[in-house]
């Protein structure tokens, strides 16, 4: 895999090039530590099993829409915040694994995209 291809694609997607973005698990752990709460406390408060939250913290499970909504309610954020953290993590790892394949795809841009590029993000 060409590192210049990978770097170019990571930059194009607004992702760090020399390190992975903050993982969903690291983010959850940082919020918990800031509040002085345990994973078990948070899991009980949001109505999920402690093992489910622990798997998120260990990056063995991604943040689903349901989990994002629960974390948002608990931490006073938005569900989109948590989904964005998960997406950045997933996209970074996929680009590192398959950059040449993605780079080889020939772009075709629909008129709707060209005309509304400023509203699509």
Tell me what each language-model feature is:
Residues 1-30, 34-35, 100-121:
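N-terminal flexible/basic segments that precede or flank functional cores
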Residues 36-37, 66:
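Residue-level signal for the short linker/turn that defines the boundary of a DNA-recognition helix
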Residues 81-101:
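Short amphipathic recognition helices of helix-turn-helix/homeodomain-type DNA-binding modules
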Residues 58-60, 87:
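Residue-level detection of the helix-turn-helix DNA-binding "recognition helix"
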Residues 34, 45, 74:
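Residues within the alpha-helical elements of helix-turn-helix
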Residues 60-73:
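Short, basic-rich loop-to-helix N-cap that marks the start of a DNA-contacting helix
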Residues 37-55:
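Short alpha-helical DNA-recognition segment
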């Amino acid at each position: 895999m060409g590192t210049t291809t990978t770097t170019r694609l990571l930059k194009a997607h607004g992702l760090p090039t020399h390190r992975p973005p903050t993982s969903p698990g690291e983010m959850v752990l940082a919020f918990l530590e800031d509040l002085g709460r345990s994973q078990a406390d948070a899991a009980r408060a949001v109505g999920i099993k402690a093992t489910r939250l622990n798997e998120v913290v260990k990056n063995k499970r991604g943040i689903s829409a349901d989990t994002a909504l629960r974390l948002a309610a608990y931490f006073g954020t938005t569900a989109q915040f948590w989904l964005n953290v998960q997406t950045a993590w997933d996209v970074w790892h996929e680009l590192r694994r398959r950059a040449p394949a993605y780079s080889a795809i020939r772009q075709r841009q629909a008129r709707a995209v060209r005309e509304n590029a400023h509203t699509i993000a």
